[in-house]
């Protein structure tokens, strides 16, 4: 059984990420893509608008083809992300960029020091690319 102080401490860590869609504290933007050698580099911009630093933020991403079929699954480490900081992360997918129609954030598998579920709930997503949707 958790004591009251421990519960309060856990809530203090998780609260910044338990936000409504209008007030998300953790934003992930698919900013651009670059093709090279049958691979597609996905460039993400991560905005941590909270006052909590993340040691780790692992996303389970699924790339779907333009026909809706699953192309690839990619486990990514987006962290560490300091509090009130914006960073860029790049990941390569073994597929041509023109084959990718959308990217699903299937799950958040790690979100230290918080809980993955709280990070997923408070995660805001966007894409600068009209032809490539990022969603959860």
Model-derived features with residue positions:
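Bacterial N-terminal signal peptides that target proteins for export
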Residues: 1-8
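N-terminal signal peptide c-region/cleavage motif recognized by signal peptidases
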Residues: 16-18
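Short N-terminal segments immediately surrounding and downstream of signal-peptide cleavage
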Residues: 22-41
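Terminal connector regions
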Residues: 25, 94-136
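Asparagine-centered strand-capping/turn motif at beta-strand->loop junctions
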Residues: 44-51
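Short acidic/proline- and small/hydrophobic-mixed sequence motifs that coincide with surface turns
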Residues: 52-56
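Intrinsically disordered, low-complexity Pro/Gly/Ser/Thr-rich segments with frequent PxxP/GP/PP motifs
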Residues: 64-102, 106, 111
């Amino acid at each position: 059984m958790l004591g009251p102080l421990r519960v309060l401490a856990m809530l203090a860590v998780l609260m910044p990420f338990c936000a409504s869609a209008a007030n998300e504290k953790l934003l992930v933007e698919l900013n651009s893509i670059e093709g090279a050698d049958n691979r597609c580099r996905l460039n993400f911009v991560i905005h941590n608008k909270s006052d909590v630093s993340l040691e780790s933020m692992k996303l389970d991403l699924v790339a779907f083809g333009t026909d809706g079929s699953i192309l690839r699954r990619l486990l990514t480490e987006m962290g560490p992300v300091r509090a009130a900081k914006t960073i860029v992360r790049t990941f390569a997918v073994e597929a041509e960029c023109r084959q990718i129609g959308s990217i699903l954030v299937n799950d958040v598998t790690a979100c230290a020091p918080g809980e993955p579920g709280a990070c997923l709930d408070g995660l805001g997503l966007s894409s600068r690319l009209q032809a490539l949707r990022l969603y959860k």
